[in-house]
C-alpha cells in the first residue's frame, strides 16, 4: 500500500434561504415547493408562532450586526429537548466574510437575509412548540440545526489516499477518518449531500502494508443521464439560470442575478404550469407533458430567446443593476 494522509477541515454549510429549504424538503420529505413556502409562512406569521424570520429570502448571509444575537438564540434553542444535546461551544464561532455566515457585502441589493430562528420570540419557543404541526416542527428543525451548525467549529478530518499495486494494475481509494465532528454534531441523523470517493470512510492504514484482495470482481457500467428534476431541484435551477448560458463571460456576470422568478413566485410558477397541463408529476419528478413539449416547440421555432433561461437571467441582472444604481432606468429600457 502507498498511503498519503492530509489533515483537512470543512466549514459548515451556509444558512438557508427559501430555495435551499425547498430543495432540501423536496428531497428529504417529498414536499412540493409550494408546501415548503406554506409551512415556512406559517412559522413566520402564524397566530401564536412567529418563530422564524422572513421566509421568502434569496440570500444565505446575515448582517454582521446580528452576530450579537447568537448567544441568545443558541440559549433559546437549547432549552428544548430537540436541540439540547447539540454541543455548541460556550463561545460560538462567528464567521464573517464571503465564506462565513455574517457578511454585509453579500446582502447588497437584497431585501431580506437568510432564514433563521426569530430572536424576538426565541424565549417563548418552549411554549410555542406544542402548538406546531408535525410539518412545522420538521421545517423549524431544519432551520434551527442549520443555524446552530453555522456557529460551531469546523468539521476536521484526515483524508487518506491509498494506492494499491496489484500485478501492475494500480487501484486508488480516497476516504476520510473523522478527527473532530465540529458542526456535524448538529446533524446526528443526516448529512448534507456528498458524492464520490471523498465522502467514504476508510479504516486506519499504513504505507508499506501488504493487503489481500477479497472476492475481486469486474463490473461493466454505463454512464447515466442527468437525474430528472423534482420541485426542489427545479427551484434551484430557476434560481441559477446562469448555468444555462453558453457565453463564459456572461456566465460569470449572471451568477449574481436572481434567475427565473423570485422566492415568492417560483413555487407558484410551477403550480401554474401544472394547473395548465404543461407539467406533471411522475414518481416525485417534474416532467413536461405532451402539451408542454408542443408549446415549447412552437415558441422555440418562433424565437429561441422566448425559451432561453439565460435571456431571463440577463434581464433580471439588468434590473438588479438599476436597483443598486449601476444602471439608469432609461439606459436599461433602451
Residue map of PLM features:
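Core catalytic DNA strand-manipulation module of type IA topoisomerases
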Residues: 1-334
Amino acid at each position: 500500500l502507498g498511503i498519503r494522509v492530509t489533515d483537512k477541515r470543512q466549514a459548515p454549510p451556509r444558512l438557508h434561504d427559501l430555495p435551499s429549504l425547498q430543495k432540501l424538503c423536496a428531497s428529504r420529505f417529498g414536499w412540493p415547493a409550494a408546501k415548503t413556502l406554506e409551512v415556512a409562512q406559517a412559522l413566520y406569521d402564524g397566530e401564536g408562532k412567529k418563530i422564524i424570520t422572513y421566509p421568502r429570502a434569496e440570500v444565505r448571509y446575515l448582517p454582521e450586526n446580528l452576530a450579537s444575537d447568537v448567544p441568545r438564540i443558541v440559549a433559546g434553542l437549547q432549552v428544548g429537548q430537540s436541540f439540547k444535546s447539540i454541543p455548541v461551544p460556550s463561545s460560538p464561532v462567528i464567521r464573517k466574510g464571503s465564506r462565513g455566515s455574517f457578511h454585509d457585502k453579500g446582502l447588497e441589493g437584497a431585501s431580506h437575509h437568510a432564514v433563521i430562528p426569530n430572536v424576538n420570540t426565541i424565549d417563548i419557543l418552549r411554549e410555542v412548540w406544542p402548538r406546531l404541526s408535525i410539518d412545522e416542527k420538521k421545517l423549524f428543525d431544519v432551520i434551527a440545526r442549520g443555524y446552530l451548525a453555522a456557529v460551531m467549529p469546523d468539521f476536521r478530518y484526515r483524508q487518506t489516499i491509498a494506492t494499491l499495486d496489484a500485478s501492475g494494475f494500480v487501484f486508488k481509494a480516497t476516504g476520510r477518518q473523522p478527527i473532530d465532528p465540529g458542526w456535524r454534531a448538529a446533524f446526528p441523523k443526516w448529512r448534507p449531500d456528498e458524492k464520490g470517493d471523498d465522502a467514504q470512510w476508510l479504516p486506519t492504514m499504513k504505507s508499506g502494508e501488504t493487503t489481500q484482495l477479497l472476492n475481486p470482481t469486474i463490473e461493466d457500467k454505463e454512464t447515466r443521464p442527468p437525474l430528472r428534476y423534482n420541485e426542489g431541484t427545479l427551484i434551484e435551477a430557476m434560481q441559477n439560470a446562469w448555468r444555462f448560458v453558453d457565453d463564459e463571460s456572461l456566465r460569470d456576470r449572471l451568477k449574481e442575478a436572481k434567475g427565473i422568478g423570485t422566492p415568492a413566485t417560483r413555487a407558484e410558477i410551477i403550480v401554474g404550469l401544472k394547473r395548465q397541463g404543461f407539467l406533471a408529476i411522475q414518481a416525485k419528478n417534474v416532467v413536461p407533458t405532451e402539451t408542454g413539449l408542443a408549446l415549447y416547440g412552437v415558441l422555440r421555432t418562433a424565437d429561441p430567446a422566448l425559451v432561453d433561461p439565460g435571456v431571463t437571467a440577463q434581464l433580471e441582472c439588468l434590473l438588479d443593476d438599476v436597483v443598486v444604481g449601476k444602471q439608469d432606468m432609461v439606459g436599461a429600457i433602451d
